[in-house]
Amino acid sequence: KEASRWRGESDMEFSQISCFIPVDEKIGLEKVAAFRTKLTEELHKAALDIDNDSTLFVDAWSCTGKVNVSSDNGKGEAAVIAVGGEFFDFHPIRLISGSYITQRDLMKDRVLLDEDLAWLLYGGTDIAGLSMKINGVPYMIAGVVEREQDQFSTAAYTSGRGLYMSYDGYSQLVEDAGITCYELVMANPVKDFALGVAKKSFPIGRGEIVENSRRFEFGRMLKLAKQFGSRSMQTMGVIYPYWENAARSVEDWCALLTLVAVVCAALPIITALVLLIRMLARGKEKLEDDVVPKLVENTQEAIRVRQRRRWEKKHGSHEK
């Protein structure tokens, strides 16, 4: 959806790409910056030069982890999603109070809590502007968000109470922090241009690149249906974020329903073919049992009549 939101009323097509990096190959901001440079170069090569390249692409990155949180009213462990770029443009989670954190924030000490964590620390959700500690370091609460309520996201998110914080801030708390998910929306002047740029220039390693803009197309659903049973085998060392697991769950259901639809659509055709074959078979039997013998008999009778006439004509003229 981010691709369509970013496109707006423009005639230019946009494509949404997700890159999932193995946990033992996670990358830093320097590689993101290098990819952005290559991305801009590729856009220029495609004759898409404009004054402000940021209008041709938008990106976000994230990683997950665990932190200890505390306030004057409570403490505990929480799941953290450390984010950078325009993360909440890609994932517009509903705000209950306060505001999102963005890359434009001068200070990287603002965090977003989910409802469960807000109730643990302060017994409510209207807590924007209050302070808390993460691993002993003071942070300011920017707001509270509501977790997605659809059945797929609810099933996919299993980390319990959690928070969102800036990737920069998280990197200061955790020495081995690294980006494991990179998301991109960019101009796609020709089919697979954006996907090709990502495959060519992004440091994906053994990870996986997903083209989200066409992931629910009919052809892809049929392909996924053929992969039933092996699709769930993950051998690349990638830990998908919960939103990707939710999307893959939706894909599985769509692939199954597509297969059912194809089978249902094919049944009348198959039935008609079977009936046609049976009719032809019966027609052949009738032809062999009735029509052909009669035709042979009539032919033989016609031959006998002609032979008799010839004989009569010959012997009759002799007698005269």
Give residue spans per PLM region.
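Membrane-proximal extracellular/periplasmic loop immediately following the first transmembrane helix
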Residues: 2-65
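Short, surface-exposed beta-strand/loop "edge" segments at domain boundaries and coil↔beta transitions
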Residues: 24-31, 68-70, 189-196
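The feature marks short, hydrophobic/small-residue-biased sequence motifs that occur predominantly
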Residues: 56-101, 105
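Conserved beta-strand elements of the Class I
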Residues: 81, 111-112
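Mid-to-C-terminal secondary-structure elements
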Residues: 86-95, 113-246
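C-terminal single-pass membrane-anchor helix
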Residues: 213-316, 320
